[in-house]
Regions:
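Extreme N-terminal cap/leader segments of soluble proteins
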Residues: 1-42, 64, 73, 84, ...
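Active-site-proximal betaalpha loop/short-helix elements
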Residues: 166-235
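Glycine-rich anion-binding loops of enzyme active sites
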Residues: 26-32, 37-39, 67-154, 247, ...
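Acidic, Ser/Thr/Pro-rich beta/coil linker or hinge segments at domain junctions
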Residues: 257-300
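Short, compositionally biased
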Residues: 152-168
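Small-aliphatic-rich amphipathic alpha-helix that forms the alpha element of a beta-alpha
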Residues: 45-72, 85-96, 171-180, 196-202
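Short amphipathic alpha-helices in soluble, non-transmembrane regions
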Residues: 249-259
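Helix N-cap motif at beta-to-alpha junctions
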Residues: 241-248
Length: 300
């Protein structure tokens, strides 16, 4: 069932299954995305809830090859001290990424605390990166900032941006735009809540393809348990599907902005995500029967 149909709206160039919608406004696309923060994070650490609300939205625009313009927020507040911490986190995120919050809405005296942000960005039409266009034969390239830490109370949130300079953090986002402008990748997705492998699964599902990934090739800090790492939200991480001849150039672009990169696998037409360690191989997702998001790409 198509609950929110976009057919019949010719201005919609990309929607369901993408990190941001792409809206045709003439010589470029306006990118439009939104993210809500899990209630558990708001309860555990409202500061990081506010900061991550900014970060995840900026990442969504970057993943499309775009550059962010501005955000609006919606806050629901029951405790004033929680509100202050959320705002403090958002303020630090605004300063870090250089993207303003220009308005929004507050629900005061609510029965719960919540923060949601929506963002707009822009991208040239020929530089748009989708997550639904990975193709059999593509290399799978992971680029990840492995210089970070886990806050004591956030087991699966790997923080890489708060301790870095504003310039390097913004350059990391700009690196994705460079990949788009140089037409180096067929598809891109920012590593989000399901971790790097889970994010790849979302890309493959939406692209209606499969892949095999060697987990031993995935960039990782030396002192982190591998299972924890693969389940972690990455402060800065992107998954690309690209022609093999472009893989090294993508890795080189990100090496200049404190990110490790590697070819970790290959896209195929199996519609299965298979993991190997060089000895054993197992199927993680079989998209003939497994569903991650259920999203399908927009038909052109």
């Amino acid at each position: 069932m198509d609950l929110l149909p976009t057919k019949g709206f010719p201005q919609v160039a990309a929607a369901e299954g993408e990190d941001a919608a792409a809206i045709d406004v003439g010589d470029q696309y306006i990118l439009f995305a939104a993210d809500g923060i899990m209630e558990s994070l708001v309860q555990t650490d409202p500061y990081y809830a506010g900061y991550f609300a900014v970060l995840v939205n900026v990442n969504d625009i970057a993943a499309m090859g775009g550059r962010p313009l501005a955000m609006v927020d919606v806050m629901s507040i029951v405790h004033g001290n929680v509100c202050k911490e959320i705002i403090r986190g958002m303020q630090d995120g605004i300063r870090k990424f250089g993207v303003p919050i220009v308005g929004g809405h507050v629900h005061p005296d609510c029965h719960y605390n919540a923060i949601d942000i929506s963002i707009v960005g822009k991208v040239a039409k020929d530089a748009l990166l989708r997550s639904s266009t990975a193709a059999p034969g593509d290399d799978i390239v992971f680029v990840i900032d492995t210089d970070g830490f886990y806050p004591d109370h956030l087991r699966y949130a790997f923080v890489t941006t708060v301790q870095k300079s504003d310039d390097i953090v913004r350059d990391q986002m700009e690196a994705v735009a460079i990949v788009g402008e140089k037409h180096l990748a067929h598809a891109c997705k920012d590593m989000s809540n399901p971790g790097g492998i889970g994010t790849l699964g979302m890309m493959l599902e939406c692209s209606e393809v499969g892949a095999i990934v060697d987990v031993t090739r995935i960039p990782a800090p030396k002192d982190v348990d591998p299972i924890r790492w693969h389940l972690s939200y990455q402060g800065c991480g992107f998954c690309f599907a690209c022609p093999p001849e472009n893989s090294q150039e993508i890795i080189d672009i990100f090496s200049k902005v404190s990110c490790e990169g590697a070819v970790v696998g290959k896209v195929d037409d199996s519609r299965k995500l298979k993991l190997t360690d060089g000895k054993d191989t197992e199927v993680l997702f079989d998209f003939a029967k497994d569903i991650i998001t259920g999203c399908k790409p927009k038909e052109e």
